[in-house]
Amino acid sequence: MNSILIKNVLFESQRVDILIVGNRIEKIGKDVEFIADKVIDGSEKGVFPTFVNMHTHAGMTLFRGISEDMPLSIWLDEIWKAETKLTPEFVYWGTKLACLEMIKTGTTAFADMYWYPEKGAQAVE
C-alpha cells in the first residue's frame, strides 16, 4: 500500500510529522518512525485540516469571466442581465462545478445562497 510521511510540517501552531497510508491519515505526532514509500520535507509548509466557505453563490460558477475586472456597478448590471435567463439546470451544474472546485482546494463545507436552492442542494448530494 502507498505510504507518505510528511516530516516537520506546521500544523496547529506546532511542527509535526504526518503519516498517510493508502487514503488514511494514520498518525500525527512528533518524530513519527515509519519507512514510507515517499518522504516529504514539510519544514517550509503548513497543513490545514479543512476549509469552510461561509459565503458562496455556487451556482454562479458558470458566470465566471463575465465582465471581469470591471467596476462593481458594471459587473452587477451584466450579472443581473445574465441571471434573468437562469434555469434550475444551470444552477445545478454551476453548483456541481463549484463543489468539485471546493473539494479540490480543501473546502469541505459551505454556506450557499442563490436561486433555485433545491437544485443547489441536489447538486451537493
Describe the predicted segments one by one.
Residues 9, 23, 44, 55, ...:
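Divalent metal-coordination and catalytic microenvironments
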Residues 45-46, 59-60, 66, 111:
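N-terminal hydrophobic targeting/anchoring segments and the immediately downstream early-domain regions
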Residues 50-61:
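Histidine-centered catalytic micro-motifs
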